[in-house]
Amino acid sequence: MAGDWHNNNQAFGNPDYLTDPQFALFASYTKIAAIYRCPADRSTLDVGGSFIPRVRTYALNSYLNWQLGAMNDNDPAYLNFRKSSDVESRHPSDLFTFIDTSPVSVCFPAFQVQMVSYAFFHRPSVEHNHSGTVAFADGHVESHRWTSPQTWDLAHTVTATGPSPDPNWLHSGGGDGDHIRIISGGGNPDLRWLQQHASVLK
């Protein structure tokens, strides 16, 4: 499906990006845009002075054949699953596919995970009592509880110039005003979980 850099609000208020075959390969199977949006998301977008609901909160694991060139921050040491046979040989029950994304972190349709880092790129949603929906390559879906208070706070932190959720956390720098990349000296159990379920070494 089509998407855009997350500060282009118009791209996230247009259901055609989800249901028009011109923009979305899933369009012939999924006719209803509402399936892409978690009902718990109450956020709105300012599009030309009008506030409208965001049409999508779910994103797809970027290691499932994400191919957007320069926008691809996937670690080349890890497998980019291009074929179903790639998935079948690598424990599909442990590989996440779609994930409920923090409303302030929704961007291109991919959910990127930095594999060898203490930094979040995209952030999971915590709207269901610190939990979010995660689907897996074997077809099962579960409500996954995120355990770190830093993850809970980060899911609602909008700008990289704002205060860190915890005084022990530091902004990683680089002037990234679009994605908050927070580092923690001790790591984050939720980030580790994402890394363990996003891909495997080649």
Where are these regions (language model features)?
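Short, well-structured segments within or immediately adjacent to enzyme catalytic domains
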Residues: 1-202
